[in-house]
Amino acid sequence: MNNIRKTHPLMKIVNSSFIDLPAPSNISSWWNFGSLLGICLIMQILTGLFLAMHYTSDTMTAFSSVTHICRDVNYGWLIRYLHANGASMFFICLFLHVGRGLYYGSYMYLETWNIGVLLLFAVMATAFMGYVLPWGQMSFWGATVITNLLSAIPYIGTNLVEWIWGGFSVDKATLTRFFAFHFILPFIVAALAGVHLLFLHETGSNNPSGLNSDTDKIPFHPYYTIKDILGVLILIATLSSLVLFSPDMLGDPDNYIPANPLNTPPHIKPEWYFLFAYAILRSIPNKLGGVLALVLSIAILTIIPLLHMAKQRSMMFRPMSQCLFWILVADLLTLTWIGGQPVEHPFVIIGQLASVIYFMLILLIMPITSMIENQLLKW
């Protein structure tokens, strides 16, 4: 009798994706983040579903419905904070996952990489719209400021913004549609993640050396299932600590004040995971220029395969590129810090310098360094 795992139409797909999948024998813990992102997505969809059962997407009741969830619903506070801090864990895993791809040259799998960039945009859109739903001060003003950026688009800008708002300001119509989009987008993300995985399994995983590993493969289960469980345990421990000890650490206290269109908060800033892009937006004094820089700060990932000049795929054997990679990481951390600071000296100039360095590193310095390293190999 044939093994049902290998013959059943559905089990066959699961088997070839998670059980008998041939994986390189030397992939490190940096390869754990794909599975962690899957866990995060499932957790966000489940907690979000239970929150949606009690949430009302109306400007009059949205804030009090969130309060009701935290005070009156059984373990509502737990579900709410798991969802809010789960988003932070999601983005930590996302950034580390993208960083791994940049360091080890995984972007050479073009389809997988480009769908990954699309996924990043989709998750960012989902998180932004989710932040609007509690209808606190930062929700309202964040939505106003960010949607208003679209008015910088020539000719159609103003009409576009009013179309998205469903009126002449952020109001009931905006909140309702944001809730609808926030509910549907995670399922689109899940579908895209399936396609991401499909394209990855066409080529197989990359590995730290960047060399072809076809001659040395091991089955995914039990080796990498066990290895992934360690990552999952660390994720759960970190998230639990955050939720149970300091659930509001990553949030903004202004969001505990109900939305008031007549009162602007002193410092409007998004959640921490958008601060690097927000800093790039603010560092350009022109509105349209800022919006373009904001979009390009993420969209630039799509052209990274074109900028790959090195003879080796991975940075493992390229010490000069390694240094530049860590400078890029430090630069992004600097931008994240600046995004949370008020617009005043010296933060403005630091943000502008960090923004210029960010684009210079990716577009110019790293490709040139790769070419220099190619020459050094001719000794």
Swiss-Prot record:
Heme b b562 binds at H83, H182. Its cofactor is heme b. It is a multi-pass membrane protein. The chain crosses the membrane at residues 33-53, 77-98, 113-133, 178-198, 226-246, 288-308, 320-340, 347-367. GO terms for biological process: mitochondrial electron transport, ubiquinol to cytochrome c. GO terms for cellular component: mitochondrial inner membrane; respiratory chain complex III. InterPro entries: Cyt_b/b6_C, Cyt_b/b6_C_sf, Cyt_b/b6_N, Cytb/b6-like_sf, Cytochrome_b, Cytochrome_b_C_euk/bac, Cytochrome_b_N_euk/bac, Di-haem_cyt_TM. Disulfide bonds: none annotated. A ubiquinone binds at H201. GO terms for molecular function: metal ion binding; ubiquinol-cytochrome-c reductase activity. It holds the Pfam family Cytochrome_B. The cytochrome bc1 complex contains 11 subunits: 3 respiratory subunits (MT-CYB, CYC1 and UQCRFS1), 2 core proteins (UQCRC1 and UQCRC2) and 6 low-molecular weight proteins (UQCRH/QCR6, UQCRB/QCR7, UQCRQ/QCR8, UQCR10/QCR9, UQCR11/QCR10 and a cleavage product of UQCRFS1). This cytochrome bc1 complex then forms a dimer. Heme 1 (or BL or b562) is low-potential and absorbs at about 562 nm, and heme 2 (or BH or b566) is high-potential and absorbs at about 566 nm. Belongs to the cytochrome b family. This is Cytochrome b. It comes from Crocidura watasei. The lineage of its organism: Eukaryota, Metazoa, Chordata, Craniata, Vertebrata.
